[in-house]
Amino acid sequence: MPSATTASTNGANGASASPAPGNLSANDNIRRFAAPSRPLSPLPAHALFNDKTRCFVYGLQPRAVQGMLDFDFICKRSTPSVAGIIYTFGGQFVSKMYWGTSETLLPVYQEVPKAIAKHPDVDVVVNFASSRSVYSSTMELMEYPQIKTIAIIAEGVPERRAREIAYVAKKKGITIIGPATVGGIKPGCFKIGNTGGMMDNIVASKLYRKGSVGYVSKSGGMSNELNNIISQTTDGVYEGVAIGGDRYPGTTFIDHLLRYQADPDCKILVLLGEVGGVEEYKVIDAVKQGIITKPIVAWAIGTCASMFKTEVQFGHAGAFANSQLETAATKNKSMREAGFYVPDTFEDMPALLKQVYDKLVADGTIVPAPEPVVPKIPIDYSWAQELGLIRKPAAFISTISDDRGQELLYAGMPISDVFKEEIGIGGVMSLLWFRRRLPDYAAKFLEMVLMLTADHGPAVSGAMNTIITTRAGKDLISSLVAGLLTIGSRFGGALDGAAEEFTKAFDKGLSPREFVDTMRKQNKLIPGIGHRVKSRNNPDLRVELVKEYVKAKFPSTKLLDYALAVESVTTSKKDNLILNVDGCIAVCFVDLLRNCGAFSTEEAEDYLSMGVLNGLFVLGRSIGLIAHYLDQKRLRTGLYRHPWDDITYLLPSLQQPGPPGTEGRVEVQI
């Protein structure tokens, strides 16, 4: 049997001794379990599970697996019941699960043969494969002699396939639980998948220790109700199986009740049948023949079917009476006549079960065991938070979008309204960047900026970097980033600086001449002033477009007017010291923030200090950089190498030998 590899243990379940606080590492909270040295001893013929049962879970079902491990932990098993996961759609990896409050790693296998070879102690498979693939996966699993029990969870398995599975399983001596089942449970030992519900329900139903009552039902949901009834009226469940609601289950009532009959620890049998099928009559025959002698408390659900004028299909595929013999009323009558304990209604079942239990306790057949200490339930953090038991500060805060509901929200605006109201890219930017709707002219201005800054030809540094990177064979993201990384104070990034300097001078009340003189005395260039190509006589049409729009639409253009006055001063000195597109956009954006009515003075200053203006240039220029990438790819251009004649080489030369102490000096000759 595999065992935990921790060297020293204390407490329940062999919990690892706490390491010294100064020696903690990321792996100190992970429990590891050694592989088994040999297969387990075979179980008695009547037993499917014990406290050493190990299984595979077929399919990626982390919640079900975690529920099984939590059950193992509170039952004080020494090892997890799940040895590994078989998931055919991914490579081999490990899945991290909780073992109590620690963590453990479960192997995930892509192929059944590898899983079987690694775990000779596994004899149970919980098959979560879909109805389309469950047939092939189950048939494959049954090829391995070590597999003795398979639970098929899927609903909708074709009846012919279900009958084939049952036939092959019977021939090979394999027990099939399902299809269309929640599974089964053996308290204190093993549970299949999601059987028993959540951990608080399992503890409330006392499924962490064995009782004396074995039940079998068709319905998985009703098996949960039986767990509750049995825990309140007796010493608890010994074993419970839901055979599934399909018409052709792999095993039937009689198969499991015969196992319970052969098990000396199971004292009372409970049968919960339903309308449809004739499996209850096999149990009746076994009782009449004396094969089953233990008391059976039984009920067939669906007595209300007689109230309808026509036959009614209930929830399960097999819950349909094709004859009078298959009706719930006839079944209950036949079971009562055969000596079963059958209540008048399902509501009377708990009282009748308690009556039978008390009788067996009185005659000494059942000796109630002392009630053990109720185990502590490990609670997932998310579940505890949902119940309001704990609180924790969030690691991140987002105030711009929310994808948790049925519809994506941009700053509280549903995405459907974004399209319905046709707010455009500028409107979306206003919602996500500024968390509010800006006036239409402001949204239009944002779009205008993106269009004007989208590209400025292949010669600028950003485009050149993108082109060279693309021609080196790099991908789109790498080529785009190569161009974006050139954006700064010298290329494209003058917007924030221009906004800061012009705003500071304007707010101080400096005249345009005083502003220019102040910057000259500080030996600073004025951001947003000057162009390498354009001049007063050869104006930048982009600037003209911005000025024309802003003058026509903005309620106030005080800072733009101030910048144009500064331009008059600078161009009197040199013709190309014009207000360039960066400077024009910057001062107009400040006018927008201050005068559109959507921002307070403090908010306007905050957004400027955040670098929102450079964000406009980055967003706009990304369009052009991607265009240059696509252009070079489309042209199938090769690796770029710069020509030698465009490079001036100035290499150092070593000085001729001279006086001692001058060795190794380097002179640069120009």
From Swiss-Prot:
Major location (coarse) = cytoplasm
Give GO BP annotations, semicolon-separated.
Answer: acetyl-CoA biosynthetic process; fatty acid biosynthetic process
Sorted alphabetically, the Gene Ontology cellular component annotations on this record are: cytosol
* Annotated positions binding CoA: M335, R336, E337, A338, G339, F340, Y341, V342, P343, D344, T345
Question: Where is the catalytic site?
Answer: H316 (tele-phosphohistidine intermediate)
According to the record, the residues making up region (Disordered) are: 1-22
The family database entries (Gene3D superfamilies) matched by this protein are listed as: Cytochrome P450-Terp, domain 2, NAD(P)-binding Rossmann-like Domain, Succinyl-CoA synthetase domains
EC nos: 2.3.3.8
Q: Does the record carry Nucleotidyltransferase as a key word?
A: no
Q: Which UniProt keywords apply?
A: ATP-binding, Cytoplasm, Lipid biosynthesis, Lipid metabolism, Magnesium, Metal-binding, Nucleotide-binding, Phosphoprotein, Transferase
Q: Where in the cell is it found?
A: Cytoplasm
Residues binding Mg(2+) are E274
**Superkingdom of this protein's organism:** Eukaryota
- Per its UniProt record, what SMART domains does this chain match? CoA_binding
UniProt GO MF annotations: ATP binding; ATP citrate synthase activity; metal ion binding
Q: Where does ATP bind?
A: 257-277, 308-334
Q: Give the multimer and partner information.
A: Composed of two subunits.
The cross-references to PANTHER family, in alphabetical order and at most eight, read: ATP-CITRATE SYNTHASE
Name the family: Belongs to the succinate/malate CoA ligase alpha subunit family.
Q: What does this protein do?
A: Catalyzes the formation of cytosolic acetyl-CoA, which is mainly used for the biosynthesis of fatty acids and sterols.
Q: What is this protein called?
A: Probable ATP-citrate synthase subunit 1
Q: Which organism is it from?
A: Neurospora crassa (strain ATCC 24698 / 74-OR23-1A / CBS 708.71 / DSM 1257 / FGSC 987)
What is the organism lineage in this UniProt record? Eukaryota, Fungi, Dikarya, Ascomycota, Pezizomycotina
